[in-house]
Structure formats: structure tokens, C-alpha cells
């Protein structure tokens, strides 16, 4: 190995620390930004959809809503407030949230309820349909919501259209549930907008350019469009042959124009079939497949219905009203253009139906001019999609991992929805879905919640807004939660629910407040906030697991996806909220972070997920029952549990909060165990504690994570038996219950891990594992995660707990008392099957409880020798003392080594609860090796404690010695009293552990195994022991190991034995390096047991890493190499290079008066001085190796940052789209209101047109137009419709009025001299046409610089100017010219990046573009703008207008003959 340079190492470590710190800060900022953007997105989307629904009401102008009411409603919508649901609904928010969540996940029930409501003629069915789309499915922003809605549509086809006598008529009427929902969906679907824009923009603009005549093909209607005078002028004398001939000629001409137009539309339809939305195609193919099976329907009829759906309901509305869909934004559509668009839409539908039904005989002639299969071919492509059962999902989901956590719904909508469901239930129209609806409604409160002032809710933003009393809701208020792919599927599904529902329907006139109701999510993990340990252990479990399949997505694949969008911004909030929540868990941040992240760390997670799914449906209702029980007494409300639902707060001293079982149904536990056993059978071996040599992780985290989740929801809250009840039977049953429910099995580790974080704030109340797994723990989970990651390196192995000793002992008593469930529990015993390397001594009698449990057998060989050292059998094989001794000798490890090994493993395997005064202390690093904490099944007594954790460490010794006395006195109390006392925190663990270790050495000596296993002690009666077992079982549940800690200890203790020879061959030890200043233990704990080399080595390595990563290179000594290389092997430790280095650092700290750094460095130097040179070199080599192995953590941070940046960018793009939709809807709303205003002033407008015709001077015409526009603006200001309009809406309205008025007088204003102007334009047009044949980009008359010729002929600029005829107002025409000029400048800048194009470069290109585009009526355009807009030109507009007129004049002078 290359000799290490301490200075280089320190340099690298400092770089690493700075980089990790800055990355974490950036990731935290990104998490906050993503949440802000997501919140804004959902609020904006909610308002935008309500505006769209309001617009539809205005267009229909139904009796229920006058234009004035619609305008008022639009104003109110803009001011919508979002209010947390609990403020309005109180504790009932939970029930409503669950109702909405379960309803949302049942598309079939929604569809059957809507159909039943229609059959019952419920008047609010339509508003409920709006609520389903906008609130329940959140406008389908999230892909999962879209998938659910597609399934609702599929069921509607089955229940509504398939059952109808005349489904086609039902569909065409457009009032059935399917039609309304399809319209809402297709209007909001972004891919549908893309398809419509790509297909229709060009042909519609072309139609607007040529909108001079109505393309009427019916001769009778054509004649009616002209006054008698015009008829005579155009066609001659009425009734004559010449008249009929002229009319027919005009009809033929119109037909030819129409055919050309329609062919253009069809061509674009075919060209853009590739971007037809997959989800719409899926609906059409589902309709075709479902209805084709109906006997009474012909295939042609079914095809006709698909055609209606595609054309009548999707494409043709966009053809007729393109501005409503954003296809055309600034070009006004006048009456002539609208008529022509309707003609196109009608022809498209007729062509699609060719061959399937008899058309109108009069249209057959015109249809004969088309290719018969032109539209049918397009339909075949769409209908021909394979009708797969599951809705299509996008292959690239940029929001993967994001999920919705709330529903936006107004109070009135919520009540309407609930009442609708109740009326459907009572209407007896439901068939097989009746039971499901009954179950849903059963959990809803009977009384209507009182309505408070604010009704809205905010989905994501509320972490900051929610009061501290509602921690859980804060979490749920976040609309976006993360789904980690490595977590269980149930978690994913839960999270997804919440985000999307963010909208409310418009059934009430003033829904200015929207409730944000939480759907109740499970635990979530914030991207980038995993600690170093967790990431490295995931890496380790993925890379080296032999027995279990590796999930590539865990870490190697895409941790950025695994943990990418767990955007629970409550982490920030949780920090302030934590202490008030659970006073005992100051550093619960660390624990929760670790436990959450480790849920998915293990490789066999998928199997665990299957087990979870098996149980999910059976346990789903248990939580509901609990809610009902608590609700009866208003307990949730009184205890402040409305949101947090932390059951531990409500438990009385005699309550049992066991998971799953109660005294009254003792068999449930065993049944549940058998189910778990069956579901997880194949996981048992995978989750064994394998030896390091085999590359396996100590514990399989995933197997456990699944069960914990299922058990979490099933609580029993029965009162425990009192002391006076028959103790034997009751306690025996209770013990079985505890054993079965507190996470013994190989699949339950996660439960136990998670319990740590949800330890009740009352130290005396020990609660079984179920609490932790409830989703309400999340607030602290994330908060904990944040704090853990805020340390320098983020990683810590565990946090010491005041109860650690008791917890540790608890592991030994799990199966002590004989019980009928013992054999069944054997496979779930963490000692026998989980830590597969040691077979457990399982006595059949109650043994005396020794003061310290024995260590487990050696587990070192794998780490040191590379071979697996396994006991002969797994399971419940009982080892005699002799066998144990023989095994030890066979694997020849010194006794001390064996003990240190086993204790390290087990102690690290238990995750302690954090105590306020011992925040973030890496527990497994500080536990001495001999303090075995869980290797055997012997009974261990809980120590009662009388000192608080903040007491001096010296108290620990006296506590320990008082143990046996305390136990005796403890026995005289009722068992539940003992539970409180023994659960009280004691002296901090590291000291007590050392005391125990010294006693081990004194009392037990090398024959500890035989002493412990052979000597029964009469001190405890069987009954008292059972009671103690129960108590320790409770404690033990909290101490289960997290995979990361287990893996850690496995390597670390192997690394340094007395001679320091162990190879550093496993990345697991890396996690031990992840410490910050907070993690340093006091020197007291170091002095307590200096002879423990394994512990000291790890401790020194930790401290030295901290010293190195904060050192400054300026302070490096110069001659360290010669000093180090010249040292003989046994020189004094003061002289080695680490000490020299530290001395310089101490000097610098003294110079800077940095007291904290001085203390750290001095402590580090004191520890280093105890090692010889060789060990110091190994120390540096180990730190360097750890540094190299931390590369995956750096990669993890980078991927998380990239993932968050991608998500943020995508959310911003989604927000842009939503804002654009909202703008389009608002502008169209204004246009409709203007149309209504002008209709009321039609008489005035006609008078104005007549006056305008009489004028001849251009100035007079301009003045008259200006005066009339001002008159209309004044009328608008006084109109009741416009009373609530904003300034922006008034400006839009003025623009709309100007466009409408100029449209009416366009020909009079544009051609003041009529035929003279038209002929003049025609002459110039022909001249330019001749020029375009001979002029090229390098023509000598133009002199375009050669550098700009590469972009010729500038087609995008040509297409801009060609559309100038579509605009009718002088302002819009100038804007069109500006867009052309700016396009040319962009292209010129692109061609030559070194210089800015000037006028000499620009004008020749402008001339060339005008020649090639040859827009019609150039001279009249110049005259029109000069007359009506010249006085308004200024700034940039004026400059480009001047360039444009100069170019037109220059074109007139070019001679095409030269």
C-alpha cells in the first residue's frame, strides 16, 4: 500500500466536507423551491379550471347564471383563498379525507354512482361530475390521477353507453356523465392541446387570410345573403337563366375553395396523427371494443359513435372556436371566418361517416370531390389501437416519485358530494358496488360539520401556515409528497393520492374559500436528506448481497428516483414542531431519518411488498374502527390528535395499544402470525443475519418494512387486566399477544426501527410497535431526517437511549416463558432466524436473570478470514454449553474477541431512542464489546431507574449496583407501575455499558456461557418474570436494529483487534466516519474504559476525521515525511506524524482563540497518543479507505440535486402551461362579454357604419372611429357586467371592442377608393411575383452580406408576414410586421455571433423576405396603418415600421427585366 500523506488526506477530507455541506444546502433550497412551485401550480390549476367552467356557463348563458353573475364569479375566483380543512371540519377532517381518498381510488364506484345519480334524476349530478374531475382527480395534473380518470371513463362506457337503448343519441346530446367528463378531460389534457395546435393552427390561419366571402354551397341560402340590389348587380335579373347560371358558378367556386380548405385540414390531420394523445386513443379503442360486444349495435353504428367522440366532441369544437383552445391567440375571427370554419367542421364529420350511413343527398355532390377514405384512414389509426386493460402511462414521467397529498374542494362541493352519494345509496340503483359505497359512507360523521368562515385549503403550502397543534396535518397539507421506488407499493399509492386533487367545482356562486383536505399520507423521505450511513449501507446491501436479489433501483440505479421527490417540506417545520410533539425525542430527527430511509434499503424489498399487499385489504378497516372508537369520546379532539393521531398520547395507564390483537380475541394473533409466515416464507432466509464474508447485510430491512406498514393500521385499544385478575392466564395471553405483534419476525424489523421515532413523550408509557408505523408519525420523521443531515457528514450510527439497557435486555426474554406459540414464533425470533449465525439457547424453564446477558457466538470469520462461519442449524436448535464452547474453539477466537464481536453486532442492531441530553450520539460506536445486547434468549431484568439522563455519568455506576435491589422492590408493585419506572431514562448508556463490561469480566470470566446457561435463579417467580417479560418486550420493540447500524458494527469491531491487523475490507465501516462536532462523546466516556481497543480505535478514527477535515493546509508542517520515515517502530507516540500534525492545529486554534476547536483537537491528540506508530498508520489508511468508499454518497447527493432541478424545471413548465390556459380562458371570457355588450348596441353600430361610409377624407374617418370607440368604452364602464372587472380585463375588453368594430368597417377603411385600391395592389402583387422568380438571396440588387446567406430564405419570417391579412386592426397588423422583423434579427444574430446586425444588414434581408412571401395588398396595408395608427406609433414600433415602408418602396423600384 502506498504510504499515506496526512496533509493530502486532510486536504481531501476538507474538500469533501465543504462540498457535501454546500450540496446539502443547495438540495434543501431546491426542496423548498419545488414545494413552493408545486403549491403554486395546484392553486393556479384549481382557479384556472374554475374559470374555464365559468366560461362555459357564460357561453351557454343558461337561466341559472346571468352574464353579470358569471363576471362576478370570475372576480371572486381570482381571489380564492385556500384554507386548511381542519379549520372548517375540525377532527372530522380525517374522516372526510379518508372518504375522499378511498373514493378516489375506486373508479368503478365513482362511475356506477354517477350513472345511478342520472337514473335517479339527481339535479346536482353535473356539479358532482365537475367535483370528481377538479377535486378528486385534481385536473389530472399528476399521471396517476389521469390513470384513475381514464378508468372512470371506461366504466362509464360500460355502465352508461353499453346499457343505453340508443347510445349514439345519448352521446350526441352531450349531457350524459361520460360526455361531460370526456369534455373536461380532453380540454385539460396538455397532449390534446399540442395535437390540436399542431393540426389546426396552419390551416385556420390560412382560412383567416382568405376570409373575404362566405363559402356557402346551398344556392338558396347563398341568394339570401345579398340584398335585392346586390343580387341584381351580381347575378342579373332574378329568375332568368343567366341568374341561375351565375348563382351556380358562385356555388361551384365556393365548393372548390371549400374542398381545397378541407383537404388542407385533412392533410394536417394525417401528418400529425403521430402526436395524437395516447390517453384519448385508449378511450376510443375501449369504446369500440366494449360496444362492439353489444348484439343490438351494428359495427357501423359503433364506428359512428367513435367518430362522434373524436370529431364532434374533440376536433370540431376546436375547429369552430380555435381561440377558446389557444390555437389562435391574437387573430380575431369575424362572422365570415366563423361561418367558413363551421362549414369545414361539418364536412369533416360527413367525410368521416362516409359509407356508414346515408348522407344528405345535397351534400353527396360536394363529398364526391374528396377522396372517400381520407378521414376514415385517420379514424382507423386511432380506433385501431390495441384495447389494453390498463390506461397508458407516459414512458418518461418527469414527476415520477411526486404524489398528491391533498384534495381541494369547497365546503359546498364536499357536502353536495356526500349527499349525492347518500342519495345514490338510498336510491337502490347500485348493484355490486353497493357494499363498497356503504363501507365508505359508514365512516363519515352523521352530522354535517359546521361551516366556519373559511372554506379553502392549501395543499402544499401549509406547512408554514399550520399551527403547531396539528403536526400531522401539516405534513399532509403538502400537496406533493414523494414516492420512493424502493419503498413499499402501498406507500407509493398513498402518497400519490394527495397531490392531485386541487380543484373545486363551481356549483356555488361565491366559492372564494377552498378547503385543503389531507388524504393522509404515509412516511416520506426528502430527496438528498439521507445520511451518509444510510446511503453507504444501501450501496453495500445492493452490491454484496448473495442470498437476496438486488434491486438495482435502490442506489446503483437511481437513488435520485428512489428518494427523489419526497418533498415533504415539513422537514423544516418539523424541527420547530418536534419538541412540542414528543418531548423525549430531541434527536428523533436522526432516528426517523434513518428509519425512514432504511425502509427500502434492503434488497429483498419486493418480496416484502408482496407480503404487505396480502395483508393490506384485510387490515384496511381496523384504523377506521379505532377512529370510530376514539370519536365516540371525542378523544382525538381533546388530545389534540385531530391531526397527529399519536395514540400514545391517549393511552391510559391500563390501556393496551397492542397491534392487531386484544384480550377478547386471543386467536387473532396466531392467525396473523400464520399469515405473515405464509406471505413472507421466502423472505425468512433472505433476512438472516449473514456473515460479513458472504457480503450479506446483517438485517434485511425491507422484509420488515412491509409488515410494519400493515400492522401499523390495526390497533386494539382494550383495557388491560388489572392486578386482581387471574394472572397466569391473562399474562400468558398477553405475552403471546406481545410476541406476535411487536415485530418479532424476520419481516418485522422495520416496525421496530420505526418505533424508535414514535416513542411517546411520556417516558413511562411504553407503547407497542404499532404506533410508530402509523402514517401520522411522519412529521417527526422528516424533521428528524433534516437534523440528522445537517451535521457535517450526516451519518451517525444510532442515537443512545436512556432505555438502552432495558431495551437490550428485552431482546433476551422474547421467548423465555413457555407458551403454546413458542414454536410458531421460532421462525420470527430475531435471535434464531434473523441473526442466522447463532443458534439460540432456548430454555424451557424460567432461568435466573443474570446481571448481563451473554454474547452471541463468534461472527468474525467472515470479516477476517473471508469464509462464512455459520452455526450448524438455524431456527430453534438448542445449543448446550459444550456445543457452544466447541463452536468457539473451532473458530478459534480469543474469548474477548468473541464477546466484543457479538456485543457490537447486537448493540448496533438495536436502535435506541434519543434522549434530549444525549442528542446524536452514535450508540453503537460507544458500546463496549462485552456488553452483549441480544444474543440469547435468556431473560433479562429491566433496571428500574431513579436518575434522569442528564445526571452525571458517575451516577451510572451506583445505578448499576442498585439494580438487583431495585428489581426486588419493583416486584412488589403492580406490573404496570413497574413498567413506568423501568421505562424511565437512566444514566447515559456509554457509562453504564462500561460498568457492565467490567462486571462481566469480574463476575463471569471466560466461562460466561456455561455460567449463564446452566444456573437457574430463583429470584423471580414465574408470574413476575412474565410481567417483566412484557415490560422488556415493550422496550425491546424500540431497540430493534436498523440495517445500517448492524452492518456497521459488523465490520468495525473486526477492524481493530489487539494487534490491529484486520483488513479494511468492507464499506460498512464507512458509516462510522459520518460524525460531526455534535457526535463527539465526552472524554469521561473515553476514560471509562481505555483498554477497550476496538471501541477506542473507532472513537479515535471518528475524532481524527473531524480534526483532519477542519484543518487548514497553511498550517501544515514542512518536514513531516522525514520525521515519519525516520521513526523506529517503538518511538514514543508523541513523535508520530499525526501528533505532530495535531500539535500544529492546536497551536493555530490557540492563536485564533477557537475554544471549541482547541477542546476537540486536544481530545483527539490524547486519544491518538495511546496508539503505537503502526496502529496510527493503520488509522490513516483506514480513514483514507473510508474516504474512497464514500464516493457513492457524493454521487447520491449529485443525483438528488439533478433530480430536484429536473423536477423544478418541469413543474415550472407545467405552471407556464396552466397560466397560459388561464390567460386564454380569461381572454375568451372577455371576448364573449364584449360580444354580449355589442349585441345590445347593434343599432348604434349600424348608424356608425352608415356615417363612416359618407366620409371621404382620411382624417375625418380616423376621428370618427376614435370617437365611436371612446363612446363604446364609456358604455362598457357603466355596464353592470363590467363592474367587477380588473384593469387588465378592461384593457382586453377595449382591444376586443376595437377589433370587433374595425372588423365591421374593414373593407370600407382598408379600400377607401374601393376598386382603384384593389387594382393598384394587384399590380404590385404581380410585379413582386415576377421578381420572386429571378431574385435570389445573393442578387446584386440586394447586396446581402455573405455571412448571413446560410439562413436564407428565412422561411419563418416569410410565414409571419404571410398572415398579415388575417389581422384586421391597424394595431394587429403593425404587431405582425414587428414579429417578422424580430424573427429576421434573431436569425441574423444566429448567423454571425461576433457582431450585432445593423440596418444595412437587415433591410436587404427584409426586402428579400417580402419578395419571396409576397403578402397580398401591400400598398393598401401601408395606407391603412398610416391613416388609422400613425399617431400611435412610437419607439420600437415606429423604427420597424419605417424600415418596412422603406423596403416596400425599394421593391417598387427593382426592375425584374434586368
From Swiss-Prot:
Bias category Polar residues: which stretches? Answer: 451-473, 578-588, 758-777, 1010-1022
Task: List where in the cell it is found.
Answer: Membrane; Endosome
Composition bias, kind Basic and acidic residues: at what positions? 778-789, 888-902, 952-973, 995-1006, 1061-1071
User: Is Phosphoprotein tagged as a keyword?
Assistant: yes
Matching entries from SMART domains are given as: VPS9
Q: Which GO terms describe its biological process?
A: endocytosis; regulation of protein transport
User: Which GO molecular function terms does the record list?
Assistant: GTPase activating protein binding; GTPase activator activity; guanyl-nucleotide exchange factor activity
Q: What is its main location?
A: membrane
How does the record classify its membrane topology?
A: Peripheral membrane protein
Task: Identify the residue position(s) of the site Arginine finger.
Answer: 172
Q: Determine if Phosphoprotein is one of this entry's keywords.
A: yes
The Phosphothreonine modification is found at: 390, 458, 470, 762
Q: Which UniProt keywords apply?
A: Endocytosis, Endosome, GTPase activation, Guanine-nucleotide releasing factor, Membrane, Phosphoprotein
For the Ras-GAP domain, which residue ranges apply? 147-385
Region Disordered: list its residue ranges: 447-475, 574-608, 738-821, 846-867, 888-1022, 1039-1072
* Tissues where the protein occurs: Present in adipocytes and fibroblasts (at protein level). Ubiquitously expressed.
Question: One cellular component GO annotation, for this chain's record?
Answer: endosome
Composition bias (Low complexity) maps to 930-951
User: Subunit comment for this entry?
Assistant: Interacts with RAB5A. Interacts with TRIP10/CIP4.
Mind telling me what this protein is named? GTPase-activating protein and VPS9 domain-containing protein 1
Q: Give the source species.
A: Mus musculus (Mouse)
